[in-house]
């Protein structure tokens, strides 16, 4: 395996170059690397670097003239409503300006243009003109604006506010303000700002404009003017350039643009008029402001959890989020709509179609990038994408979901990360999971295009849906993992959870696919002597068996299955399934079901850590009043968590005689040496059990997935944590395997504590225990989480976390600047080694 890359380098897998601004493009063919049907698609070859698009030239808006006098845009607009003035109301020409007003900071910032301009554009300041000598946007993290707008945790010095809520600023003038003076604030975004599209905002002080913006004087004292500015709850989100214009009888003055005066505007879940409004403060604290969370994985019976550093307030992350919208070519005028924004994000977090953030890889070969299990957060991924412009290798569902949570929370949408256990992937829109067997009930893998993932991770975000009938507001599913196309591109959602719950698969967006993931049935088909297939068993409670997320204001797991589906087996749940299936490609699938099921079967697997032997058992129960003879076939194989299976490495055939009302078990022992050569990611195995009851003809069928667990890292804080002071953490790991782990890499990350750091530690011997220590300097106070992971070719999915309560620096809150990108990889010697 190649050494880890600190900057994640360039994408190693080819993608079709389809960066278009519209959402409806044709579906391009995709390779299906490392898996057979029913799984996420991924690219397959090394790309040539994608050149950065050339910026479109901005039209010269100062070139028009009438009667020898140029006309500025602002001068052509009425001060009270921004409508066009009459042709005679010409106060002068705006100087030509071709600066870029893109929303992200990936490129260089424009320079200030000097000392201001008058109406004639010659820089002459005449007596009586009102000159703005300076602006204070009160943008410090400790200032009123940032605190009131809940943006004080952003590691930025610029002003960051939320729409629909007033903010304050101060103008410094060349003379005292007079009531006859006319002042207008201007905000511009994009390369070609237009008033009609909301990308050029003119706000006359003391009056509102037709777009809902207002600016009022709150205090005039000497040569200082305090203003309160109110944005509409539907304002475009992004980074705006801010300038000021004044008009007096002596002439017009324009303050030159200063990069320090850029203003970021975000969605506002605290504003009742904003369609992203959330009416629960606890939810806002957790789903918008919480910088870390839990992501669940594994199987329903063996749930694992990992802490993820969302890091939405880290320096550079906000610019990365806005760069994603820019890279997609999303029109600025549509960036005030959270439905459109979240749909674009679901397309752009994966690299297919658009050269987005992450390259998906389910092949098991990650030598040209980072194993998805090695990531501990989103910050390193997003900063690499912002810095290089290239897709980052590699991601799987929990990585796509973790990054999506970061992006949507950063932009102001209440978002949570959701795990669905036994998640179906319906490839033929039948809204059922179809599994095919031969005459002896051995799986026909070449026909099993549908798959059931052990788990799948996606996102819920909260918003109203004005594009749907009433009753579908609230949680909306957004899934950035590239599985199937939607309108020709790899995106999914937003989809109302309420429509999923009731099987209303005709509601947009992508409801049929999401419904099948959580509430379809497993249908078992057996090949008959004439080659046709017959339904022999329908498993109604096998899909979407548990849907969970991190609980609000807690590290506990919350079961949210009930918001996605009615109680399993209830009349409402059956109606939802059959309503949805009626709109699928096999609407009559439930018409040919057989009954007479008096033998029940249950499968259990022993909980074991990787490196240990284990057993699986099948429990049969005869619920009839007569004897039953059951012929059982057990097939054991390894499986990717996406439901794609490897070859069968162990099988067993048994005949079991059950007395009336009795139970019996069939046990299959599995030694470490038997499963170790076959293991793939996540350490999961699949037991296919099929059987035939001699007396009644009943067919038994069951698929049971289980996994061997991986060990955790142990983190210990050595001393107190204070802003600006060096702190030390100790990491201890014991290798559970009898083999050497080679090219071991640790990752360390924590918002407000540690920028993403990569540590190369070499090899770790079989059953060896190692200890290493690392120092870090906290930059923000409060409760924080430091997260670590370990990865090697022989062992992955190893991680740990520690809570760090950071005290403020003496004398204040003690924020420190935390700029800079990820650390490059370093070779770290272990402080101690020992045999376990």
From Swiss-Prot:
Binds 1 Ca(2+) ion per subunit. Its main location: membrane. InterPro entries: Ig-like_fold, Ig_E-set, Papain-like_cys_pep_sf, Transglutaminase, Transglutaminase-like, Transglutaminase-like_sf, Transglutaminase_animal, Transglutaminase_AS. The modification Phosphothreonine is found at residue 46. It is found in: Membrane. GO terms for molecular function: metal ion binding; protein-glutamine gamma-glutamyltransferase activity. Keywords: Acyltransferase, Calcium, Keratinization, Lipoprotein, Membrane, Metal-binding, Palmitate, Phosphoprotein, Transferase. Palmitoylated. The membrane anchorage region possesses a cluster of five cysteines within which fatty acid(s) may become thioester-linked. It is subject to phorbol ester-stimulated phosphorylation and is hypersensitive to proteolysis, which releases the enzyme in a soluble form. It catalyses: L-glutaminyl-[protein] + L-lysyl-[protein] = [protein]-L-lysyl-N(6)-5-L-glutamyl-[protein] + NH4(+). Its cofactor is Ca(2+). Interacts with PLAAT4. Belongs to the transglutaminase superfamily. Transglutaminase family. This is Protein-glutamine gamma-glutamyltransferase K. The lineage of its organism: Eukaryota, Metazoa, Chordata, Craniata, Vertebrata. The gene is TGM1.
